[in-house]
Amino acid sequence: MLESVKANFTESIQTMIASLEELPEPIALATQMMVNALINGNKILSCGNGGSAAHAQSFASQMLNRYERERPSLPAIALSTDTSTMTSIANDYSYDEVFSKQVRALGQTGDILLAISPNGASRSVISAMEAALSRDMTIVALTGLDGGEMAGLLGPNDVEIRVPSSRAVRIHEVHLLVIHNLCEGVDDCLFPETSQE
């Protein structure tokens, strides 16, 4: 048991170190894209399934409420929170459309879709990306493995933050850290703290 726990910590640390080597640039780019969108009066929609839905909701709540400092609310919507909408879409159409129909209704040109899937193959998230592209939105994709089908949908104005791991649990761990970096970066750019001297 103890060896298993230690092995999990070791693997997690190794994945974080590998991510440190590969992810700062796409994270910084995604942060700047979000800042620009918010300055221009746009919003950020976020989606994912399972643990990724929790990450999408965490991101939106930290935009709407706050991350670590007091500041005005920022416009963000997690598409996985309205169970009535999601279940009616899944029942009447298909689960694949639970996010895409919301993107078509809520998304506007200049908005950002934060699309989260550890393997880049979640059909409902891919459909949301396709809907976002049809609405002339920009996409920030949080993926892992080889990026899956999601990576193939991205254009030159989009950004992929791909965790260098093949294990979903490790990818989820890094995705949460990425989301915290995005939130902190947005706050730093829009609401810089002034030093008290």
From Swiss-Prot:
Sites where the protein binds substrate: 49-51, 62, 91-92, 122, 172
GO molecular function, one term: D-sedoheptulose 7-phosphate isomerase activity
Principal location listed in the UniProt entry: cytoplasm
Subcellular compartments: Cytoplasm
SUPFAM superfamilies per the UniProt record, alphabetical: SIS domain
Positions of the SIS domain: 34-192
Enzyme class at the top of the EC tree: isomerase
GO cellular component, one term: cytoplasm
Pfam families: SIS_2 (PF13580)
Cofactor descriptive note: Binds 1 zinc ion per subunit.
Similarity comment: family membership: Belongs to the SIS family. GmhA subfamily.
Note: The reaction produces a racemic mixture of D-glycero-alpha-D-manno-heptose 7-phosphate and D-glycero-beta-D-manno-heptose 7-phosphate.
The protein's assembly and partners: Homotetramer.
Protein name per Swiss-Prot or TrEMBL: Phosphoheptose isomerase
Organism whose genome encodes this protein: Pseudoalteromonas atlantica (strain T6c / ATCC BAA-1087)
Lineage, opening ranks: Bacteria, Pseudomonadati, Pseudomonadota, Gammaproteobacteria, Alteromonadales
